Amino acid sequence: MNSYIREKVDEYRERYDLPDLKVTRSDKEGKRLKAVYTDKDGHRKKIYFGQEGAYTYADGAPDYVRNAYHARASGQYTKKGKQAISIPGSAASLSYNILW
């Protein structure tokens, strides 16, 4: 994990009040990272996120690629109508805030 990702994980912990958030390499095929944390109800969550092998802003992708990703991700909503990137601990939120 590079220093950019470590810095973004620290920011994410603080922003979403997830002090025990740990992000490591994924052990699941096709996924890049794994996040483990305790949610507000006290349940342990394990979320896999990021496409394995994808070239993200964390890897040095240019700003225009980041902007395109942000535009796409901002338009994703859950079945209940909530913006996916605004849900703390979701794969969409983790990818948006840590990898991009």
UniProtKB/Swiss-Prot annotation:
Keywords: Virion. Pfam families: DUF5754. GO terms for cellular component: virion component. It is found in: Virion. InterPro entries: DUF5754. Its main location: virion. This is Uncharacterized protein L851. It comes from Acanthamoeba polyphaga mimivirus.
